[in-house]
């Protein structure tokens, strides 16, 4: 197939779950298909590094674009304009005329069999019912993230704004799924949600993969009582959960296990996350080149998400390294894991703290959970297996379009 792949927000470095999922899918597809990638890069991204690591792409076009940041005049203008349009602000700020023009030009100039809109954020730049059949790669159910943010927001004025946003996002997401030839969700739970809201859409579920050769137990010594959290800290659900964990849950754990420590690993921590470093036993690393040493040194991994969508690659990566994981229901949502067999599930602060304390005191239980998790991802969720399924669904779309 000749594939046109469109993604906003950059792809390199691989410092978010979405980038990892997109990168590994593309890397596998380029082994067997002719792929043109059209993307954007911000001030901290590395387009040259991307081209070197996706050398199998027939062509890569990366346009400079800095997304408006909250609190800036550009963001205020985007917010105002989005209020006057059907687009929610999260999509309005990713409207990139130059990108849309480049996509239209390529669709006219080349004979593509398929276009992939990578994330809902790419759809303002892609004609979903245009001349090339389009697949929407939905890493999240976006409106559910905004809905959960609305319900978790304590300030009434902000909750009212978020209420408007999630309803606009639901309308747009429903329309986009309906217009695309196929929507690929990353879990059965997401597939069911999208299908319920867009009954005329064709939606399938393809699981998330993990690089089981890169994330592997390395036999290094664990630090006793060490907890680790990994994730992009400029994504609000990650910021929200780790601040809540550090301020509410971690002190409960420390009462029972005084020498417990918490390492927060991830890019772009804001002031709220940075302030956690003032709590005894907490370390905030900021951006790191490689998360594996931090995961390897940890006694267990915590995923205390309260809002979110899609699937959490951080859990698969921890399991691939043979680590025990304590996660909320939302944190493990969409992953094919059995609570009690592959991870420990806990939601309320006291319940989560008790689960962590129990595992810190039970090395045999930690080892059993980590071993079961490693077996699961190794046997069923390598990227080569997952992308073969993605590829087959794309080939069906192309066959039906002929």
Report residues per predicted region:
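Short hydrophobic beta-strand element within catalytic cores of glycosyltransferases
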Residues: 314-317, 324-328
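Conserved acidic donor-binding segment of nucleotide-sugar-dependent glycosyltransferases
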Residues: 343-350, 358-363
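Conserved catalytic-core segment of nucleotide-activated headgroup transferases in glycan assembly
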Residues: 196, 204-297
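Donor nucleotide-sugar binding/catalytic pocket of nucleotide-sugar-dependent glycosyltransferases
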Residues: 135, 143, 162-217
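Acceptor-binding helix/loop patch of EC 2.4 sugar-transfer enzymes
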Residues: 8, 69-93, 132-171, 232
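Acidic donor-binding loop of glycosyltransferase active sites
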Residues: 181, 281, 293-310, 321-324
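A short, well-ordered alpha-helix in the C-terminal region of glycosyltransferases
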Residues: 365-379, 386-392
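N-terminal subdomain of nucleotide-sugar transferases
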Residues: 1-63, 108
